[in-house]
Swiss-Prot record:
It is found in: Cell inner membrane. PANTHER family: INNER MEMBRANE-SPANNING PROTEIN YCIB, INTRACELLULAR SEPTATION PROTEIN A-RELATED. Its main location: membrane. The chain crosses the membrane at residues 22-42, 50-70, 80-100, 122-142, 148-168. Belongs to the YciB family. It holds the Pfam family IspA. One of its GO terms (cellular component) is plasma membrane. The keyword Glycoprotein does not apply. It is a multi-pass membrane protein. Plays a role in cell envelope biogenesis, maintenance of cell envelope integrity and membrane homeostasis. This is Inner membrane-spanning protein YciB.
Length: 181
């Protein structure tokens, strides 16, 4: 259910962009992201930091897009969010508080060096996505960027999550694998 909630604002953004324009879609994205935050809190009594960061970025950059009537701001939002996520993972690693281990460590037992590799891999992923977004956003037509944002980055994230899951499964202790089968 929670994963479905995460995609609703993006689906609304895409649909309204195709029906109207980037400004209508951006306004709807801000509203849908705010509603998503409220619903998530109502259902789970907590909001993840990533959701909160995304909401703040959507509101600030989306608001600037609408107020200044300049779609460059919403394009920059995607790159900045990816950079913030990458920086957050780096800082957490330096401070000895691995974020991904914190998210999955209760369900999955892995050696710390494997958690570090997963962390570094996600830093690389977010960095590549940030750079790719910059290229597509500012070198391609708006329609191409919207499709890339919705389908390209979402598809890449899904695949990377799948590959991370395969890596985790490969390195799980044998007794944990047997429990899950």
């Amino acid at each position: 259910m929670k994963q479905i909630l995460d995609f609703i604002p993006l689906i609304i953004f895409f649909a309204l962009y195709k029906m109207y324009d980037i400004y209508t879609a951006t306004g709807a994205l801000i509203i849908a992201t705010a509603i998503q935050l409220v619903v998530t809190y109502a259902l789970y009594k907590k909001v993840e930091k990533m959701q909160l960061i995304t909401f703040i970025m959507v509101t600030v950059f989306g608001g600037m897009t609408i107020f200044l009537h300049d779609d460059n701001f919403i394009k920059w939002k995607v790159t900045i969010v990816y950079c913030v996520f990458a920086a957050g993972l780096i800082i957490a690693h330096i401070l000895g508080k691995p974020v991904i281990k914190g998210m999955l460590g209760k369900e999955v037992t892995l050696p710390d060096d494997k958690w570090a590799k997963i962390n570094h891999a996600w830093v690389l992923f977010f960095t590549v996505c940030a750079i790719a977004n910059l290229y597509v956003a500012f070198e391609m037509p708006l329609d191409v960027w919207v499709n890339f944002k919705v389908f390209g980055l979402l598809g890449l994230t899904f695949l990377y999550t799948l590959f991370t899951g395969m890596y985790v499964y490969k390195h799980m202790p044998k007794e944990k694998k047997e429990e899950q089968e």
